[in-house]
């Protein structure tokens, strides 16, 4: 059945099951393109941003995207000459993830998951190691930090990606870069210590990825807490052993902690101090030292999964700067390996090997066979949607909206500031709500509250 909304006087309050693996994606419904900083000017790109198309079957979600964010990218202060370019991605996300082999499957170079805006994430490595020996691998969060734009992203041969939580540098109590001062970007989301962080993406094993704040207790109780990783810095001053205790031959030693090393890129880079944490092998997992397991995740209740799900968390330190392993060092679940391109996997090159060889439907906002048509497309969007707890908005936010329930009653009035920060729907009756843009008088968006 299909309901046509006129004004916002629709008559049925629909109690709809959440399908976050479908509804979480930020679809490009306005044809907007990406943009980047060139000097002091924002330049409009030709390629569309966000996700272009979402298709699904009973077992998989297929996500089509260019890998271009809506938020501004560039410049890259390390001199990276590349810009974000369209990648024509097709990703395949399992809808019913299964636990993988004991110990998980290590992530490799290249993309390891995809954010809800179609931009990919990488693991902590930057593809280089000390003396090119493949023993002491560089931590991209340290060596590449000076080359990230305000949103903490950068391109590798046009493939724009994030190695760590996709928030802006200045969304921190002690920013590790000042690039946002002159070249601001809102990034994917902002941190809120009082709210559960949003669902920000999916790994290629099908498990969701959240920002760094979750419920203090896995059952959803105890308020909100920062998820603390169990990966800790080792207590070493020389790099002569690996985290598992392996004693290295002298020709495999890394630089002493704090010694000066010259990064391999950019050409002519000045030496930097190889502080503890500069290399992946400076870290070890200490059971019980944090709230997350060795995959940087846990099984817990989340707003989108009220019955609980295994989920990864993009971890930050107490200053809200990215903290190793940033996303996840290995997959807990069975990995859909067609998501990796031509390079070694998991990880691979820039593309994917995904093809659709089954019957699929196109996601248009339908839930359980019910779809809605509005009389005006929205220039802004809500996420997550469906939403159980806190709803946030992005895009071109109106100065104020009124929210109507299924009986046509105005139940709330929200400002642009409040919409950007997030609004709690806790205690609201389940149903479908409509936003009316008071500037244009148009009813532009549905919020599904199961």
Predicted regions and their residues:
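Extended, compositionally biased non-globular segments
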Residues: 207, 212, 221-344, 365
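Extracellular-facing segments of soluble proteins and assemblies that are Gly/Ser/Thr-biased and enriched
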Residues: 106-207, 212-215
């Amino acid at each position: 059945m299909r309901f046509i909304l006129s004004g916002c006087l629709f008559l049925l309050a629909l109690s709809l099951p959440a399908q976050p693996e479908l509804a979480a994606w930020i679809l490009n419904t306005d044809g907007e393109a990406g943009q980047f900083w060139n000097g002091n000017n924002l330049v409009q790109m030709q390629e569309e941003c966000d996700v272009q198309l979402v298709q699904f079957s009973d077992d998989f979600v297929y996500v089509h995207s260019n890998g271009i964010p809506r938020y501004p990218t560039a410049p890259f202060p390390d001199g990276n000459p590349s810009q974000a370019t369209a990648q024509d991605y097709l990703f395949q996300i399992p809808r019913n993830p299964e636990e993988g082999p004991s110990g998980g499957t290590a992530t490799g170079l290249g993309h390891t998951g995809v954010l809800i805006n179609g931009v990919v994430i990488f693991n902590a490595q930057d593809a280089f190691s000390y003396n090119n020996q493949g023993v002491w691998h560089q931590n991209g969060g340290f060596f590449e930090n000076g080359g990230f734009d305000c949103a903490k992203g950068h391109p590798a041969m046009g493939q724009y990606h994030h190695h760590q939580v996709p928030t802006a540098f200045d969304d921190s109590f002690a920013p590790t870069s000042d690039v946002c001062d002159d070249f601001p970007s809102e990034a994917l989301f902002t941190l809120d210590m009082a709210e559960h962080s949003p669902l920000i993406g999916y790994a290629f094993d099908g498990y969701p990825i959240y920002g760094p704040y979750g419920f203090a207790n896995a059952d959803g109780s105890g308020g909100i807490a920062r998820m603390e990783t169990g990966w800790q810095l080792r207590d070493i001053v020389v790099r002569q052993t690996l985290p598992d205790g392996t004693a290295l031959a002298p020709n495999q030693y890394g630089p002493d902690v704090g010694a000066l090393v010259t990064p391999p890129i950019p050409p002519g880079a000045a030496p930097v101090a190889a502080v503890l944490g500069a290399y992946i092998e400076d870290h070890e997992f200490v059971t019980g030292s944090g709230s997350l397991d060795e995959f940087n995740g846990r099984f817990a209740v989340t707003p989108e999964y009220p019955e609980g799900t295994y989920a990864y968390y993009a971890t930050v330190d107490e200053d809200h700067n990215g903290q190793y392993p940033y996303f996840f060092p290995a997959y807990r679940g069975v990995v859909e390996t067609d998501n990796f391109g031509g390079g070694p996997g998991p990880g691979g090159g820039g593309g994917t090997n995904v093809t659709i060889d089954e019957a699929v439907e196109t996601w248009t906002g339908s839930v359980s066979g019910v779809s809605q048509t509005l009389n005006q497309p929205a220039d802004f969007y809500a996420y997550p949607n469906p939403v159980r707890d806190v709803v946030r908005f992005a895009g071109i936010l109106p100065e104020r909206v009124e929210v109507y329930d299924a009986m046509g009653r105005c139940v709330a009035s929200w400002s642009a500031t409040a919409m950007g920060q997030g609004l709690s729907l806790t205690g609201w009756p389940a149903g479908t709500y409509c936003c009316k843009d008071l500037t244009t008088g148009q009813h532009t968006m549905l919020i599904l509250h199961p």
